[in-house]
C-alpha cells in the first residue's frame, strides 16, 4: 500500500473518486459493471474492501493492463461485454471509447443491411420489441394546458353572446 492517499485517481482517462471501494470505483468506468469489477479484483488478488485511493500507481497500472488486453484470462466468457465479435469471432471485453466505437459500428452495419433492427434504428423507434402506442413519444405535446386556455375563451364568447341578445 502506498503511504499517500489519492482522493482522485485517473483510470482509463476518467477521474474516479479515490474514497470509493474498488468494485464501485471500477464500475464507474464505461464497460465495467460491478460484477465484472469484482471478478477482476478477485483475479488480481486485491482486497475488494480497499479504497481506490490506497492503491499505488503500479497497482492501478496493473488493473488497467489487465482490462486493456480486451480478454481477461481466467474469467468466464459470459462475463465479457462483447462475445463472438462480428469480425474476429473472439470473446472481448471492451471499455471506454472502444466500446462506444464498436456499438456505433454495429448499429451502422445493421442500418446498411436493412435488417429489422436497422430499420427501427434508422427511424428512431424502439428496437427491442417494446410497445410504442403510448410510450416513447417525442416532439411537442398538446397537453391539458391548451384545453384549459381554450375553455375561458369559449366562456367569454358565450357571455358576450348573452349580453348582445
UniProtKB/Swiss-Prot annotation:
Q: Matching Pfam families, A to Z?
A: Ribosomal_S13
Sorted keywords for this record are: Ribonucleoprotein, Ribosomal protein, RNA-binding, rRNA-binding
Bias regions of kind Low complexity — which residues?
A: 153-165
Would the keyword Transmembrane be found if you checked this record's keyword annotation?
no
Which InterPro entries does its entry note? Rbsml_uS13_C (IPR027437), Ribosomal_uS13 (IPR001892), Ribosomal_uS13-like_H2TH (IPR010979), Ribosomal_uS13_archaeal (IPR019977), Ribosomal_uS13_CS (IPR018269)
Q: Which GO terms describe its molecular function?
A: rRNA binding; structural constituent of ribosome
Cite a single GO BP annotation: translation
Report residue spans for region: Disordered.
139-165
Q: Name one GO cellular component term.
A: cytosol
Could you say which protein family the record assigns here?
A: Belongs to the universal ribosomal protein uS13 family.
Stated role: Located at the top of the head of the 30S subunit, it contacts several helices of the 16S rRNA. In the 70S ribosome it contacts the 23S rRNA (bridge B1a) and protein L5 of the 50S subunit (bridge B1b), connecting the 2 subunits; these bridges are implicated in subunit movement.
Listed HAMAP family:
Ribosomal_uS13
Q: What is the annotated quaternary arrangement, including any partners?
A: Part of the 30S ribosomal subunit. Forms a loose heterodimer with protein S19. Forms two bridges to the 50S subunit in the 70S ribosome.
Query: What's this protein's name?
Result: Small ribosomal subunit protein uS13
Recorded source organism is Saccharolobus solfataricus (strain ATCC 35092 / DSM 1617 / JCM 11322 / P2) (Sulfolobus solfataricus)
| Encoding gene (name) | rps13
Amino acid at each position: 500500500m502506498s503511504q499517500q492517499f489519492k482522493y482522485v485517481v485517473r483510470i482509463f482517462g476518467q477521474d474516479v473518486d479515490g474514497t470509493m471501494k474498488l468494485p464501485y470505483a471500477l464500475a464507474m468506468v464505461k464497460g465495467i459493471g460491478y460484477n465484472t469489477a469484482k471478478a477482476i479484483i478477485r483475479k488480481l488478488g486485491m482486497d475488494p474492501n480497499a479504497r481506490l485511493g490506497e492503491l499505488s500507481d503500479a497497482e492501478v497500472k496493473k488493473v488497467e493492463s489487465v482490462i486493456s488486453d480486451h480478454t481477461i484470462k481466467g474469467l468466464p466468457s459470459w462475463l465479457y461485454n462483447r462475445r463472438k465479435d462480428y469480425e474476429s469471432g473472439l470473446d472481448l471485453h471492451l471499455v471506454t471509447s472502444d466500446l462506444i466505437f464498436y456499438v456505433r459500428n454495429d448499429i451502422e452495419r445493421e442500418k446498411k443491411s436493412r435488417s429489422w433492427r436497422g430499420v427501427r434504428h434508422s427511424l428512431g423507434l424502439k428496437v427491442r420489441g417494446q410497445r410504442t402506442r403510448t410510450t416513447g413519444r417525442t416532439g411537442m405535446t398538446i397537453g391539458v394546458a391548451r384545453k384549459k386556455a381554450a375553455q375561458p375563451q369559449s366562456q367569454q364568447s358565450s357571455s358576450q353572446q348573452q349580453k348582445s341578445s
